[in-house]
Amino acid sequence: VRLLAPMALAAALLLTGCGTGSDPDSGAAKLSVRSAYIPQPVSDTMAAGFLTIVNEGGAKDELTSVTSTAAGSVTLHETVGSSMREVDSLDVPAHGSLEFRSGGSHLMFEQLRRKPVEGETVTVELHFAASGPLKVDIPVESAVYTPKTGH
């Protein structure tokens, strides 16, 4: 009985900090993915991936890595001017988005285990500095697929 009172107090104190908070500016990042696709690759060993990570939360986050059983490695790339370079991470701003698009930031699937074809999906897991991982099934589109922009 002597141990129950301190344990109950400790549990109550822990739960005090677990409020849900209705203010969207007060919380962590709230991440989702849209417009994901992989153009059917020409190469047997590499493919590019595109998607948009949307953050509706009040805190920024950072995409730190991407994993997939479809490839030996998946790396993050950004295009600066006319050159492409690998980066360790990319920011996902609060109340903003990180867009991976042709000619800009993109995922590079290297050492493909097999070449994905149009109509299939490739599962990836996005890893972030603060948020938990997001699993995404990315459809494989034709090599000349152009996403709708809403214009």
Q: What does each model-found stretch correspond to?
A:
Residues 14-17:
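C-terminal motif of bacterial Sec signal peptides marking the signal peptidase cleavage site
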Residues 20:
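Short, conserved catalytic or interaction motifs in soluble domains
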Residues 25-151:
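Compact, glycine-rich, soluble single-domain proteins
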Residues 1-7:
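Bacterial N-terminal signal peptides that target proteins for export
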